[in-house]
């Protein structure tokens, strides 16, 4: 036995040393001596001397095993770099995860089955089969499909915590848990809770055609949050402004809210896609700027079909909670189960470019301050007003129809434009005053790819739900065939 332990220790040392010394030397060096940022709060990295003295105490605080032997000396540096203040702030953030055995959600007739191989692998198969036998047409867990909803709940939950308890709120015992129990219980997994998984699913079905058991994307999640906020004004958020396809915010829409009440609390939900297959490196500084803002309530996103909740960063790594850790549905200890000091780190290169950004504005003065902060952002754009004739609303997670007042004509008019269903159409002639494609940054969306830059839509089926509207979709990728030009009504009048 002793011989086996010795061999195991040697093997572990080799693996760790290989990763530390033979891997890339640039990223670890860049991570040294950097502050930790948590939703606008700054925590200096603790120096080695004070870190060594408090390492054991912090390990116990985090509920981790303490050892003064081999493993402690090997991994102690990373643990000791966390200050107690930083860990307490992390633990005080609200974190929602997968749940099991909650109040059943009925399966849609044309939706996925509650029983899947993925579910059997990731849970206790006996319990899963028992639940399926008891409720064969219901979902008792969101494992495998609810992670984006959970990170959306985390984003909304932290916004409500800041709104009701302040950014300096910390979990430090039963009294503090009692203070936040009111709004955290709004997220319990019951149909009665206004922000429960059940109500997210209902809103997703109505607004985004998402069936129970289907994975939500950032756009569907944003729409659900907005709808649930409007349906529950008692939450304290006066308005929720959503952009599902860009980081654009329109001043006239925001100022209209403040005209009614200068102290209005507004939640911005910005669905953005910061690259093609990976986040473009040019956005790093702007992402850090968003998480450094005192108005930030986090970012939901992460990896394809595997969402994470990002609440901060340190050096080149972004700090996140992982919702893919199942917990049983509980009522008595629900608030306590929504806190953890365990978090992960992710490099920008590992992140999926589709994400949902949350910003909480508390009054007109806060709005004016935040506008100055994002003036140089490469992600968020504060514009005077929305263009009336081309009001686009398209999602990143699915192809959705969008409407435009200037195109509300009978579908038969397509023939007059000289286009057919399925054609890629260059709309530059119709909307010459829209963003000039020649001015598009070569690193924005297209990265280093040299391509034909045109404003295009894809002509849809004219025999759809509303025959009085010309259905079209915004196409944000390269096309495989030439676009079809159309005559400009403006040119004809001239």
Curated annotation (Swiss-Prot):
Main location, first listed in the record: cytoplasm
Entry's localization field: Cytoplasm; Nucleus; Preautophagosomal structure; Mitochondrion
Catalytic residues as annotated in Swiss-Prot or TrEMBL: 147 (nucleophile), 322, 324
Catalytic activity: [protein]-C-terminal L-amino acid-glycyl-phosphatidylethanolamide + H2O = [protein]-C-terminal L-amino acid-glycine + a 1,2-diacyl-sn-glycero-3-phosphoethanolamine
GO biological process: aggrephagy; autophagosome assembly; autophagy; autophagy of mitochondrion; cytoplasm to vacuole targeting by the Cvt pathway; mitophagy; nucleophagy; piecemeal microautophagy of the nucleus
UniProt keyword annotations, A-Z: Autophagy, Cytoplasm, Disulfide bond, Hydrolase, Isopeptide bond, Mitochondrion, Nucleus, Phosphoprotein, Protease, Protein transport, Thiol protease, Transport, Ubl conjugation pathway
Activity regulation, per record: Inhibited by N-ethylmaleimide.
A GO term, aspect molecular function: protein-phosphatidylethanolamide deconjugating activity
Span of the annotated motif APEAR: 102-105
EC number: 3.4.22.-
GO CC annotations on file: cytoplasm; cytosol; mitochondrion; nucleus; phagophore assembly site
Pfam families reported for this sequence: Peptidase_C54
Tagged with keyword Cytoplasm: yes
Enzyme class: hydrolase
Post-translational modifications reported in the UniProt record: Phosphorylation at Ser-307 by ATG1 inhibits autophagy: it takes place on autophagosome membranes and decreases its interaction with ATG8, thereby impairing deconjugation of PE-conjugated forms of ATG8.
UniProt motif (LIR) ranges: 424-427
Family stated for the protein in its record: Belongs to the peptidase C54 family.
Record comment regarding domains: The APEAR motif (ATG8-PE association region) plays a key role in ATG4 recruitment to autophagosomal membranes and ATG8 deconjugation. The LIR (LC3-interacting region act cooperatively) and APEAR motifs for the interaction with ATG8.
Assembly and interaction partners: Interacts with ATG8. Interacts with TUB1 and TUB2.
Additional record remark: Present with 3300 molecules/cell in log phase SD medium.
Biological function: Cysteine protease that plays a key role in cytoplasm to vacuole transport (Cvt) and autophagy by mediating both proteolytic activation and delipidation of ATG8. Required for selective autophagic degradation of the nucleus (nucleophagy) as well as for mitophagy which contributes to regulate mitochondrial quantity and quality by eliminating the mitochondria to a basal level to fulfill cellular energy requirements and preventing excess ROS production. The protease activity is required for proteolytic activation of ATG8: cleaves the C-terminal amino acid of ATG8 to reveal a C-terminal glycine.
UniProt protein name: Cysteine protease ATG4
Taxonomic source organism: Saccharomyces cerevisiae (strain ATCC 204508 / S288c) (Baker's yeast)
Gene that this sequence comes from: ATG4
